[in-house]
Amino acid sequence: MVTPVRLSALAVTTTVTLALVLLVGCTVGPSQRPGLVVAGSVPAQAPPPPTKSSALPPLERPAQGAIGWTDCDTVTRQRLSPVTLPPTLTFQCARVVSALDSPSAPGEGLVRLQLLKVGQGPTPLLVVNDLNGLPGTLYAAELAAQLPPAFLNTFSLIGMDRRGTGGSDPVHCVPAADREQIVDYDPTDTDLTGLLGASLDASQQCILALDTRSAALDTQRTAEDVDTVRQQLGVRRIDAIGHGEGSRVLTAYADRFPGHVGRMVLDGSPDPTLDATGVAKARAAAAEATFTAFASDCQSRGACPLGGAPDSTLEQLLAQLRTRPEPLADGGQLTNGTALNAVLAGLADRSDWPALATAIARAHGGDGAELAAFVGPVVAGTATDPPRLDADLASGCNDQQDRLAPAQVAATMKAWTGAFPLFGGLLAQSLLLCGPWPVPDQPLPKPVGKGAPPILLLSTANDPVTPGTGSQRTAQQLDSGVLVNWLGSGHGALGQSACATQAAQHYLINGTVPANPTTCPP
């Protein structure tokens, strides 16, 4: 079993993901509660001439909002340390209160939502992140440093920590031993007794600790939180960016509140057409493709620390750890399960790839500290943020009704080993984690967004968290989806692909909708 490790500089910046499948009226509206261009480091050519769309609502200067912002510049920089953000950025924070609205107590209870504001623009632009990535406030702070200046001259980014994450009444209910067992588990072991036991205990402890909160952590109620924030900001329509699984919150919002949708960018949307097994299988395929891109990138840099065959180096490391876990300085161990979860996490952020290659090589040489640090935020959290696994489990299991028996999961592991030799077992095992959790009464509705303005979707070809086909199928299902395909790698295109970022800039700032579809090369 691996003891929580101390985070390195690397782990703070990594988008860590466990293999869990998981203009109407003149005033602020009430809630309804009960194309080919060069991208990356190559200078981008102009995308295909976009079409001016009168269907996109104008940007709003908000009426007087009800949010009292206070300076949080120092604490934000401390939370992101050792990441250095430009001194020109300043950060303000606030809290707003939304209804908890548990299924067992509709309309009752409260949840406090943590917000962060960065940018000097008059129009608020809400930012919603993955459950298993940085809290939305910190993701917005990092995103502000990656976007062209025009974004922050037009908008103030408003990062929102989703209920149960970051500073929004964070969930911290999974016993440490269970958390470690889930992350450490041997991805080749089809005897799932230990993993099932940890999942069962985790679900029981969270249900006891959270009580009525447990069932109130889901996408639909988070969409209600978005409308609460919209009202508090003083706008009739909310402009927003959803990253990864955070995109699903915005499609749910578009279905529930189409008249309050402004300009929305969904960067890496989950596939709404797949069940849990289909999602895990798509992720396994995408993770394999992303690792291939990572290996090619390593070799293209010269003197790749993983040698001429990075996949073989990783396989050798995993085989070694399967029988001889590496001791860590804090008394813990690096197992093959922890190592593979760490690699999956590191693949998500392309800027971390050089450090990931070095970490794998050092682990292969007997020093696993840097590789273990990639899963630190999942297992141990940080001094200011709880472990991410807890909210990811609770919310993820509330969003899907599929529950697989251990025998089904073991059979799936065997079936996927040939097609997905690195990540098939790990992603198949993830299908067991929701088994002990209560099944939600209603499935998550398929997104339609009927009556909403055009919604821009950014797809990344090799995305190990939300595979590119998810954005493509979401665009097909939405009444007004417009797709930009980036043929690159990593989790999300915004701020990573110059082409996709430019398309989003034209859409958000100028109100121009790109050709559908538009393709951006790597």
Describe the function of each predicted region:
Residues 1-17, 238-239:
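N-terminal export and membrane-targeting signals
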Residues 21-25:
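C-terminal motif of bacterial Sec signal peptides marking the signal peptidase cleavage site
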Residues 27-30:
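Bacterial signal peptide processing site
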Residues 49-338, 394, 400-522:
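Gly/Pro-rich cap/lid or specificity-loop segments adjacent to the active site
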Residues 270-288, 358-361, 368-382:
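Flexible "cap/lid" loop of the alpha/beta hydrolase fold
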Residues 326-340, 347-352, 382-390:
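Structural motif
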Residues 347-361, 402-407:
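Short helix-capping/linker segments at secondary-structure and domain boundaries
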Residues 369-400, 404-405:
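Long, low-complexity segments enriched in small/aliphatic residues
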